[in-house]
């Protein structure tokens, strides 16, 4: 019933915008070879950027640990105590992550944006990366102690989500920086595609790792998986005062 109601609401919204939005004729080129050539030139210009190979590796592995964690964390929260999980109900999990976690994630992103605007990305990227990755250790603690106190669990989730939002700000700003110049919008779209690949591929084998080693050892593996992303920061070339308000 819920999804049916949502589909009806989306249909009504689409119909409304179809009627209300102005209809303008746009000239479109049907020359497929020209479109392919433009696509090729944009792609080529992206891969000819200075130190682009380092940038691509960084984008791919910055969230290597978190890409695995995000797939398994919900299962850990909902799994029974006998299976090594926390045994939360769907309602409890939804409140902790959907409400508290989302709020802390947003606040972390806002705080990160404010700090970068004041002092620039170069000064903060290491600290933001650490803020994203170090809180992952709360899952190691929870998998070891299996706390039943919902306030404690909620607090740990908030810490991890705040750190994630805080650290993700630097990640986005870096992609914006390397996308600057001609075709910046297209180049940023390429970056987001690479970013999505960096989330999808590690998530594909995270379940297999968890089933083989259990929750506790899996979360230790997640901590170890965050190290390559931290190391890559050493090789990045970041513009002085980039992101800082002038």
Regions found by a protein language model. Give the residues of each.
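C-terminal membrane-cytosol helix-exit motif in multi-pass small-molecule transporters
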Residues: 8-27, 232-237
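Juxtamembrane intracellular "pre-TM" segments in multi-pass secondary transporters
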Residues: 25-55
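Short amphipathic helix-loop junctions that connect adjacent transmembrane helices
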Residues: 62, 71-94
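Helix-to-loop junctions at the C-terminal end of transmembrane segments
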Residues: 107-124, 210-211
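C-terminal ends and interior cores of transmembrane alpha-helices
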Residues: 130-148
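Hydrophobic core of transmembrane alpha-helices in multi-pass small-molecule transporters
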Residues: 149-170
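Intracellular juxtamembrane helix-capping segments at the cytosolic ends
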Residues: 166-180
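A late C-terminal transmembrane helix in Major Facilitator Superfamily
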Residues: 178-211
